[in-house]
């Protein structure tokens, strides 16, 4: 066993864990040596690793916690246990952990790198490897029986890690440099005066205001003749068919369209005698308009269907 004076110091509150694989005599001897180091003001507490999560220690209770340090202990410390250790350690407190590791990944045991990573993820810093040594035959047998690993790449590693000098969730004000206020660009007085229009200038006799009625003369107000709007050569020549240009704006397209559309003016409805509209005195015996009042020529008159059948 290395000199404990390098692991704990006088006056500290120290916690030591053990499990079913730990030797009872070795545990008593180890605790006795620790008490000699931390005495008289220090204290050593002993915890079963399986009951640590149920012990409900207050935050920041211990200056140092030793995991797996009792002779004969073969234990893999879970992430939950390591997180609890980080909680009950005082700011700046130290964790010394010792457990078996494997050289290759994928085994039941962690690799040294994996163990260091788990400690950092638990909130600990300054992770330092103190030693790594091969197992003796008795320790190898314990790994096989207790952990179920029968590889030849097993060794024991001891690592020291520290809790940061602040509590988890604590806050501190950051002294950030003050932001410089942007300076406004300087304004040239001459340029400002050039673009400034005084209200009094609007009534100044020297200011000439254009009369909108004088902008157009009489020629501009005349309605142009349609022929003057035609483009050069538009629709000219009797030997060729008149055709409007694409996107015609001179009115030729509308003119040609009007020529194609037949007149829809209704013609006056003719009658056999031509006198039906004058009244019954001028209607023949078979006239369907008998009994109806006189109407204007071309006026639309609705006839009784019965009279149409009789006719």
UniProtKB/Swiss-Prot annotation:
A Gene Ontology biological process term: apoptotic process
Sequence motif: Cx2C motif 2, positions: 284-287
Gene3D superfamilies: Vaccinia Virus protein VP39 (3.40.50.150)
Function: Component of the cytosolic iron-sulfur (Fe-S) protein assembly (CIA) machinery required for the maturation of extramitochondrial Fe-S proteins. Part of an electron transfer chain functioning in an early step of cytosolic Fe-S biogenesis, facilitating the de novo assembly of a [4Fe-4S] cluster on the scaffold complex NUBP1-NUBP2. Electrons are transferred to CIAPIN1 from NADPH via the FAD- and FMN-containing protein NDOR1.
Family, similarity comment: Belongs to the anamorsin family.
GO cellular component, one term: cytoplasm
Localization, UniProt: Cytoplasm; Nucleus; Mitochondrion intermembrane space
Cofactors: [2Fe-2S] cluster; [4Fe-4S] cluster
Signal peptide: none
Sequence segments annotated as region (Fe-S binding site B): 273-287
Region Linker: start-end pairs: 177-221
InterPro entries for this protein: Anamorsin (IPR007785), Anamorsin_N_metazoan (IPR049011), CIAPIN1 (IPR046408), SAM-dependent_MTases_sf (IPR029063)
Spans annotated as N-terminal SAM-like domain: 8-176
UniProt binding sites for [4Fe-4S] cluster: 273, 276, 284, 287
Originating gene: ciapin1
One term of GO molecular function: electron transfer activity
Domain remark in the UniProt entry: The twin Cx2C motifs are involved in the recognition by the mitochondrial CHCHD4/MIA40-GFER/ERV1 disulfide relay system. The formation of 2 disulfide bonds in the Cx2C motifs through dithiol/disulfide exchange reactions effectively traps the protein in the mitochondrial intermembrane space. The C-terminal domain binds 2 Fe-S clusters but is otherwise mostly in an intrinsically disordered conformation.
Species per Swiss-Prot/TrEMBL record: Xenopus laevis (African clawed frog)
Source organism superkingdom: Eukaryota
Protein name stated in the entry: Anamorsin
Binding site for [2Fe-2S] cluster: 234, 245, 248, 250
Annotated stretches, region: Fe-S binding site A: 234-250
Keywords: 2Fe-2S, 4Fe-4S, Apoptosis, Cytoplasm, Iron, Iron-sulfur, Metal-binding, Mitochondrion, Nucleus
Subunit relationships: Monomer. Interacts with ndor1. Interacts with chchd4.
Cx2C motif 1 (motif): residue ranges: 273-276
